[in-house]
Amino acid sequence: MSKAFTRENEDADDVEDEDSPSLPALPAGTKNYITPAGYQRLKSEYLHLLNDERPALVQTVSWAASNGDRSENGDYIYGKKRLREIDRRLRFLAKRLENSQVVDPAQRGECEQVFFGATVKICHGDGVERTYSIVGDDEANASKGHI
């Protein structure tokens, strides 16, 4: 049998430098400032993956493994790959939640300063007004005005 198009190490996907390539890792000892809504979104994603998606996938992979030949079993191969992705995301979320410091902008009240969690209106010279919210890395989305 030819080994031309097979991987030498099936677990090659497990070894990665980062848990999530979408955001850089925080430097050691750095707090991850986040709004209460952002913290809740991260926590709900973590709990959904841990309690719903992962157990269902483990059951599917178990069933696929019991069908015999794993080398040509699409359900098994895809399931294992997806399981690695979920585990990677769970590790990333756990680190982010552990290093999070929730900052509630409502406790600051009205003031004339820009601070974390503030919503700022900017008026350009041509009269166009834009609204931006100052948020942490996990919530940043320039298209929605979250910077």
Where are these regions (language model features)?
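Helix-rich terminal scaffold detector
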Residues: 1-91
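Residue-level signal for pocket-adjacent positions within structured domains
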Residues: 21, 29, 97-98, 129, ...
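A short linear-motif detector with a strong N-terminal bias
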Residues: 27, 35, 42, 98-101, ...
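Generic structural "secondary-structure junction" signal
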Residues: 36, 72, 99, 104-105, ...
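Structured, basic alpha/beta domains of bacterial-type, RNA-associated proteins
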Residues: 89-107
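Non-DNA-binding regulatory cores of transcription-related proteins
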Residues: 103-147
